[in-house]
């Protein structure tokens, strides 16, 4: 299952969804012959790597959301010696404007393939120099795919989700509302969003974007 909060804030909704995933998977453990790889820690790390995504325009909120996920990994671990190095969440919880989009290079599938190979390696890498090298390569691939456009785009930063299911299974969150928009922003939203009519409210824009992010049958 792939879950996204496009206005992630401090990460309350993704952490809540992670706990639901863990509760469900843990309930099934008693019915399985092997318990290997089915600790609470294993479930949490797997959910963070494979199920949870978030975006926020506020860098401070993004860092708090990352910290919240990191803390959730170690909070139940009684033996500090058993705690593994924390994963790298830079391409899981991302700073960006969820209402933006980017024109893509039409001939970029090989770039996406490489990007989707590097991100799991970056997530799990503990060596500082290797992390820097992976991040450098990932950022360069994103630059090439976007033709140097630095705006955020879900289909680029979370491309693995859209290549497998063409969207998320679940989009959650509390859409921001009542934000002050410049005339330039209003013109952009009127061009890109059907809900941008009359007095434009970011709540409606986020709701429209959330629906567009869903895979077929998503909620």
Each model region followed by its residue ranges:
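SAM-dependent methyltransferase catalytic region
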Residues: 1-219
């Amino acid at each position: 299952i792939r879950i996204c909060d496009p206005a992630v804030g401090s990460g309350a909704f993704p952490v809540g969804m992670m706990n639901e995933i863990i509760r469900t998977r843990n309930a099934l453990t008693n019915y399985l012959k092997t318990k290997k790889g089915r600790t609470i820690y294993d479930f949490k790390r797997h959910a963070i790597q494979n199920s949870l995504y978030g975006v926020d325009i506020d860098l401070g909120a993004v860092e708090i959301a990352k910290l919240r996920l990191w803390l959730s990994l170690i909070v139940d671990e009684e033996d500090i010696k058993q705690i593994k190095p924390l994963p790298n969440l830079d391409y899981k919880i991302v700073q960006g404007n969820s209402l933006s989009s980017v024109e893509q290079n039409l001939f970029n599938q090989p770039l996406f393939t490489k990007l989707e190979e590097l991100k799991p390696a970056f997530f799990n890498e503990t060596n500082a120099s290797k992390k820097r090298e992976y991040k450098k390569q990932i950022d360069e691939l994103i630059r090439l795919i976007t033709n140097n456009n630095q705006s955020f785009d879900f289909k680029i930063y979370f491309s693995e989700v859209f290549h497998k299911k063409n969207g998320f299974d679940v989009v959650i969150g509390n859409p921001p509302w009542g934000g002050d928009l410049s005339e330039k922003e209003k013109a952009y939203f009127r061009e890109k969003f059907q809900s941008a009519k009359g007095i434009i409210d970011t709540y409606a824009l986020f709701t429209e974007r959330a629906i567009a992010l869903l895979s077929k049958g998503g909620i």
